[in-house]
Structures are given as structure tokens and as C-alpha cells.
Amino acid sequence: ATSPRELGRKSLAVNLSDVAAMGAAPVASFLSLSLPPGVTGVWIDAFLAGYHALSTQFGVPLLGGDTTSARDRLTVSVTAIGRAENTHLKRRGDAKPGDRIFVTGYLGDSAQGLQDMLSGRDTPFIALHNKPEPFVNEGIWLGGRNEVHAMMDISDGIASDLLHILQMSGVGAEVSLDMIPTNTPIELAVAGGEDYKLLLTADVGAAARLAEDYKAKFGEPLYEIGRIVAGEEIRWLDRGNPVLIECEGFAHF
């Protein structure tokens, strides 16, 4: 199960990830809790300790919020405020044909962790599900690179999230399944969600240099997984051969 401390940390992490995915620096957050009967002071203290640990790590103060009682269900609502130069903001609708597609880390770990947790298995993937690490400094740095065109974080699975970029940019994509970094079945890597890695497109002429500079700066690779093409859909390839992927990311209601 997810501990209250992990839940507190994760509730802020996913919001910092949203801010970083636009190339912005998070500067503050607001937290609202709706608490059902049975939630103890010990639980609340642990939740806030997890939240505070991450806010301290990235220097993002909690400036306020609200606490109310609920009839039967816990609700956590976080708002993160970010700041960026206008020229550094990265949006979903700016991908261009020829762009190379990158992700900043392994995909599928969180979905595997959720499966393992629900089935009672004790594996290292569970910690990756409960404690996602937002790419805050990486997002800020990528925001300052003009060759990065479109960017977002992967919260719903790359099959779903890449489609958002394509639809808003009016383009298509070719993605090589064999190039996707993963330790899990490819279905989880493609559609699992809650990975909170950054997904970005970069100008083809500067993509190799971008990857080199990123590796030099952060000590981790940018993983190239495909390219933007004309069209309006994702073509999935496996070692150059077209394949059919039937899976959906998380669908918001």
C-alpha cells in the first residue's frame, strides 16, 4: 500500500512535474485536503512530512490552502505555481515534421509497481510507483533550449500523451518500440502511465547536440524513440517493421 508520507510526497511531485514540463521553475504550491472520518492526526502529520520533504528539496514553499471534512472519501488538491521566460515556455502544440522524439527515462516502472502492489508481490517497482521523481531541473534546462519544440510529462502513458502533442501540433509520429527504454512488458511502457518522465520533440539538426549536452549536464541519457512526420497518427515500428498496438492510456473523465 501507499503510505501517507508517500502520498503526500507524490501529490506534490506530480504537480511539480506539470510545471517542469512547460520549461518553468516551480516557485510555490497550495494544498487543499478534504478529510473523511477516521483520518488521524498521525496520518496527517505523515502526509505533510512527505509533502514538506519534496517542497524543501526543490525550494517550493507551501503558501496556503484549505482543509475541510468529507463524508466518506479523501480528496487531495494541489496547485503549483511556476515562473518562466516567455521564450522558454514549452507547449504541446509546437512539434514540427522532422523533429526527433525523446523521453528522459525508463517507462512502465510505475504501472508495473501498481500491478505488483495490487497482486501482493514485493518488488522494487512499487517504490518507483509510490515515489516518482519529477524532472524539475531537467525541465527548466530544456525550457532554455530553442531546439526543443514541444514538451509535456508522461502521466497517462506515452500512447496517450504523445497523441496530445500530435493533435495539438497537427502532425503524426513514428515511434520505434525497440528504442523505448523499459524494464517491463512493452504494453506497460506504452500505456501504463504515471511515469512522469518528460516527453519532448527537438529540431532534427540539433537533436544529437541536445542529447550530448543533456548527458553532460545531468549524467543521464535523453532517449530518442522516434520522429515527427506529416499525418495525424502514431505509427508503431519494431526494428523498422510496422506493428499494431492496441492499448489506451489513462482517460480523464
How would you name each of these model-derived features?
Residues 81, 199-203:
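Short hydrophobic/aromatic beta-strand micro-patches
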Residues 130-133, 211-253:
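Acidic, Ser/Thr/Pro-rich beta/coil linker or hinge segments at domain junctions
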